[in-house]
């Protein structure tokens, strides 16, 4: 969990038995302290490894099978991925939730050999977010503007996806 903030995602993953261990990192010490308090509150502190890290720089490859990067801009997510060679191992899965610059991130991913396997939208309160599930295939490709702006969202049939597409069309 890159950019863990208060550690809620890490705790949720453990509580819901999605995984039995989580490495959560943040670039600042204060969010890591908050994440430790959250882990202690929910009794999972023995299964969370917290690391002070700029992106994935302090995360050993052995601790990063699935990589989750949420709540950052698309350019920062691309930078984090570009600085970490092991994200290009085909066994790794990426879950990315960009807050801004989504077309930039899609272009980066596709042009550097990542495949966007699926996209979905989710609504939290009044905000609609897009989530990308990606993996490295080594197949680099250029994408057109339509795909850069909409990705695989038009294929999704959920109400959240329709809401996301409407929101994006109004923004353009």
Can you describe what each PLM-predicted range is?
Residues 2:
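Conserved beta-strand/loop positions that form the S-adenosyl-L-methionine
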Residues 6-19:
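Conserved SAM-binding loop of SAM-dependent methyltransferases across substrates and taxa
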Residues 17-18, 40-46, 86-89:
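Short helix-capping segments at alpha-helix termini
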Residues 21-26:
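Conserved SAM-binding motif I beta-strand of class I
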Residues 30:
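Conserved Rossmann-like nucleotide-cofactor binding loop
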Residues 33-62:
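S-adenosyl-L-methionine
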Residues 57, 63, 75-171:
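Class I S-adenosyl-L-methionine
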Residues 64-71:
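Short SAM/SAH-binding signature in class I
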């Amino acid at each position: 969990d890159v950019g863990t903030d208060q550690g809620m995602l890490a705790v949720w993953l453990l509580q819901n038995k999605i995984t039995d261990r989580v490495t959560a990192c943040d670039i600042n010490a204060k969010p890591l302290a908050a994440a430790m308090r959250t882990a202690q509150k929910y009794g999972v502190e023995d299964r969370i490894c917290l690391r002070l890290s700029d992106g994935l720089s302090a995360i050993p490859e052995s601790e990063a099978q699935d990589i989750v990067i949420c709540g950052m801009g698309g350019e920062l997510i691309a930078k984090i991925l570009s600085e970490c060679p092991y994200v290009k191992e085909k066994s790794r899965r990426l879950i990315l939730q960009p807050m801004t610059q989504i077309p930039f991130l899609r272009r980066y991913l596709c042009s550097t050999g990542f495949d966007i396997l699926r996209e979905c939208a989710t609504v939290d309160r009044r905000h609609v977010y897009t989530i990308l599930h990606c993996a490295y295939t080594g197949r680099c490709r250029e994408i057109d503007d339509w795909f850069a702006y909409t990705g695989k969202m038009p294929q999704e049939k959920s109400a959240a996806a329709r809401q996301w597409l409407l929101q994006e069309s109004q923004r353009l």
